[in-house]
Amino acid sequence: MSVLDRLLRGLLARPVGDLIRQALDDELYRYRVHGDPGRLHVDPTAVINNALFNVSAGEITVGPYAFFGHNVSVLTGNHDINKFGRERQTAIQRSGRDVVVGDGAWLASHVLVLGPCRIGEHAVVAAGSLVTHDVAPYTVVAGRPATLVRRIEHGEAGA
């Protein structure tokens, strides 16, 4: 292959590669909302990535400087196991299952949060964890279901 051929191939491949990279980046940082988007409140300083928010049964609030890894799901909705057929699909509680993610909280990749619950400020939820209850501020939780791993020391300067 001549130098000219390699140069032309490189020039043609670069813009296409850039477009593909941009499309992938856009998908990695786009979150989805199931339900009324007005029930989702995300502080502008929060970093969300490609999360799924289900607001069918409550509000979801994400505080300042909170951040999510990839593929985090926050669900307020659930279905009544005592219903059957179409009624099981449609009998959904419409409120009261709010989720609050506190200031500076970190939800690592593949975390699943089932409301109602509150994740305290500066708490850390380890990758792959299942949150089914409140998480205290300044704690690390992990597992399915998430349980306390340790407390995070904090002082006036770091708070």
Name each model feature, range by range.
Residues Y29-Y31, Y65, Y138:
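Sequence-level detector for tyrosine residue identity
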Residues M1-H34:
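Membrane-proximal basic amphipathic "stem/tether" segments
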Residues R32-H34, A91, A127:
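Short, functionally important structural connectors and interaction interfaces within domains
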Residues D36, H41-V42, V47-R118, R144-P145, ...:
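Flexible, glycine/small-residue-enriched loop-and-beta-strand segment within the central core
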Residues L75, A126, T132-H133, V149-R151:
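Conserved acidic donor-binding loop of glycosyltransferase catalytic domains
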Residues R118-A142:
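C-terminal/domain-terminus segments
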